[in-house]
């Protein structure tokens, strides 16, 4: 038997990090078992579903590094992979009628004026009432007894059927409800394992009843604890941004996000920083924690920073350029060798691509702004002009433009005792970058190059505020 798993988002907004983690766990198990991973779009909510959201979700999944073997964009043997298209083909209607014929479901006719008022239930199709414009739904008859199933994470579960009560499976507009459509789709797409958030746990007995009524084999279920905010309630917009799109925009690497999401409930020994794809063989569904986990943006940034320093510098440059394009920022135009030097020294002090962009900006562009503290504490002093004048002279005479060479000039300027060494170094640092926190001063000067450094000193000397 081929193991088959799926991720089935509703296209009503951006991909939530909780959804991304669910997709990741499904993907990990499918790949580990040499099975198939299916993407299905559950777009039966006509008022909220949009093509724009579907496109955004697919783009976010691809960016996360999650690929699929079948889906709405690539097709497959068990399509269509959009529920709205499956409605058009009459798939759900066909199985709803089978349930009615077996008297496992029934039609409900509603009053034309008070559309919530039930007139009667029947196993016979009320064609006459349909012609008169009455709303008609199909509801599932919940049998007596207890519904039991084994959850891979939570163990043996049971629900009293009497507490659940009959439920609608086809709405008056002809569209299936979630609990009905998901059973039909999972069965016809031959899904063997259903991994999803524990907020779906209460839906499971309803779905199992439908499986049994149709005489179908039931897949294995696993319900994953939800990601929580710091107040231990399910992570939502009130806790701040929660979409994959947001974290991509602020400069989180896909490998950093996937690593962190994997840590939310799954562990690989003592390791906290790893490439998720390299840990496929270690993934065991039963090893996922059965407790809710808190989403910590600071820990995410920490993990991401580790990845930024782990990957080779060429890969970081490629990620950096793609992120700049994605966020529509100004692209550096320089030799790649120069860019690699800049990123190599700057990545040590940052944890996101956004921070890297801001931190490295003055290496790539001349229109950087001067920090207020630099201006007030160093540039607007009585000694600033004298040091900058002497810096222009000494750096112009420097033949050995290297880390060692620039260090000698900086120390020579400090030895003149015009100001303390710290004040001299901070003035020079701010003069060429606009910042008081940068990579090492001598390394910064060496990378920027003689021409750019002298031009920046001269520009400040000619400024009004200096």
From Swiss-Prot:
A motif ('HIGH' region) lies at residues 9-19. InterPro entries: aa-tRNA-synth_I_cd-bd (IPR045462), aa-tRNA-synth_I_codon-bd_sub2 (IPR020751), aa-tRNA-synth_I_CS (IPR001412), aa_tRNA-synth_I_cd-bd_sf (IPR008925), Glu-tRNA-ligase_bac/mito (IPR004527), Glu-tRNA-synth_I_codon-bd_sub1 (IPR020752), Glu/Gln-tRNA-synth (IPR000924), Glu/Gln-tRNA-synth_Ib_cat-dom (IPR020058). Its EC number is 6.1.1.17. It is found in: Cytoplasm. ATP binds at residue 237. It catalyses: tRNA(Glu) + L-glutamate + ATP = L-glutamyl-tRNA(Glu) + AMP + diphosphate. One of its GO terms (cellular component) is cytosol. It is an enzyme of class 6 (ligase). Monomer. Belongs to the class-I aminoacyl-tRNA synthetase family. Glutamate--tRNA ligase type 1 subfamily. This is Glutamate--tRNA ligase 2. The lineage of its organism: Bacteria, Thermotogati, Thermotogota, Thermotogae, Thermotogales.
